[in-house]
Amino acid sequence: LAKKNIELNNLQKIIDIDLAGCSNKSGYLTVDNKKSGGGASLTSSIKGTEIPLFNLENILKQNNLDSAILKMDCEGCEYDSILKTDNEIMRKFSTIIIEYHYGYQNLVEKLESCGFQVEKTSPMYYSHYHIGYIYATKN
């Protein structure tokens, strides 16, 4: 669906889609195909599909980016991905939008320590967990 949307809007030269997971480290993860859908998180499984994992530094390097906008909706991986990424790498993003699931305080502190001005929404109860949004921009 995402690829079709990119084609319909003539964005092929702007947006690239990698079928992968985001993590604090690069590697591979086997995902159980039966545990998918809205709100599914990436946890390692014995059976399923092996997918590559990329960290934020790898994503910037592989796409030859010195600056980027980051939008994360990764069902819980935002904590390791953001909190364990070096501040120098985080500063390469001009804008960061994050859907959070288990609280925002640590994420906000990390982003502010990287020089971002941060706004957040109050958590909303959705299905069986709370979610909210963080909007971080450079001054």
Go through each PLM region and give its residues:
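Phosphate/nucleotide-binding beta-alpha loop and adjacent structural elements of enzyme active sites
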Residues: 1-139
